[in-house]
A protein has these predicted regions:
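N-terminal first-folded block
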Residues: 1-32, 36-37, 41
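Glycine-rich beta-strand-turn "strand-cap" elements at beta-sheet edges
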Residues: 2, 41-49, 75-95
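Short, well-ordered beta-strand segments in beta-rich or mixed alpha/beta enzyme
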Residues: 2-8, 40-67
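Short phosphate-engaging motifs
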Residues: 15, 49, 72
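An amphipathic, aromatic/His-enriched active-site/gating alpha helix that lines ligand/cofactor pockets
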Residues: 25, 29-34, 56-89
């Protein structure tokens, strides 16, 4: 399983509501994709500009397919990425 945590920071506080709406929409679509084990989006209660994505994919292939899918290419990439600073952290789940 591949685990990915993505830290997002809104560049402009005026875009927080828009980012939140786009991330919610992308999350719902991503959860329906083959190989998606977990896909959650969190909005910080203490840092309003901060969002955290937690993704678990069955395989690298599933993640690669996600990056070709609608949620990533029609919502996340064009509508969210230009509005945020982004830091991805691939990780291994400890057992």
């Amino acid at each position: 399983m591949l685990c990915l945590t993505v830290l997002l920071l809104a560049k402009d506080p005026a875009h927080i509501k828009e980012i939140r709406e786009h991330l919610s929409q992308a999350m719902r679509k991503s959860r329906a994709e083959p190989g998606c084990v977990r896909f959650e989006v969190y909005h910080s209660q203490t840092e309003p500009r901060r969002f955290v994505l937690v993704e678990h994919w069955a395989s690298q292939e599933a993640l690669d397919q996600h990056r070709l899918a609608e949620a990533y290419n029609t919502i996340y990439k064009p509508m969210v990425m230009p509005l945020v600073e982004r830091e991805g952290h691939p990780a291994t789940l400890l057992e």
